[in-house]
A protein has these predicted regions:
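Conserved N-terminal beta-strand and adjoining loop/helix that marks the start
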Residues: 1-23, 41
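Conserved hydrophobic "DFG−1" position in protein kinase catalytic cores
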Residues: 16-17, 24, 93, 110
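Conserved Nudix-box catalytic region and its N-terminal flanking loop in Nudix hydrolases
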Residues: 21-57, 61
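Short secondary-structure junctions
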Residues: 62-69
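Active-site-adjacent beta-strand/loop module that shapes the phosphate/pyrophosphate-binding cleft
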Residues: 66, 76-99, 113, 128-130
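NUDIX/MutT-family hydrolases
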Residues: 92, 101-133
Length: 135
């Protein structure tokens, strides 16, 4: 009998909110994975790194903000444009220091329309976040 192993990398996804808007990034055109898409800021979890630390590191690297508090929203599975399988752990950033700046993407901007994001998985994540906020 042949065994099948599903290998996937961990990805930490941050939802940064201001009023009724959430922060998105347009990935650079020269990215090898999902170039120029509009998506939530995220990044790979390093080996032996806990999810919360990965999220804090990624938000500092990509947005220049120091994350103070987070709330788990959901876990999703996604296959990137290069075939990489990802387990995406999505967190609402409830408190942070600093003002977000674009450090890694083509641009960042505040958005209120989930349909402006390219990935269905990101749209579902923001919907879930909004449902949790209403409770």
């Amino acid at each position: 009998m042949r065994r099948c192993v599903l290998e996937a990398v961990g990805v930490a996804v941050g939802i940064v909110v201001k009023g009724n808007k959430f922060l998105v990034e347009r990935r650079r055109w020269d990215e090898t994975v999902d170039p120029e898409i509009v998506c939530l800021p995220a990044g790979h979890v390093k080996p032996n790194e806990c999810l919360e630390d990965a999220l804090k590191r990624e938000m500092m690297e990509e947005l220049g903000i120091q994350v103070k508090e987070i709330k788990f929203v959901c876990k999703n599975f996604y296959v990137a444009s290069n075939g990489e399988r990802q387990h995406a752990y999505c967190y609402l950033v409830t408190d942070y220091e600093g003002e977000p700046v674009c450090k890694a993407a083509q641009e960042i901007f505040w958005e209120d329309d989930i349909n402006k994001m390219n990935l269905e998985i990101d749209r579902k994540t923001v919907k879930k976040m909004r449902e949790l906020q209403e409770k």
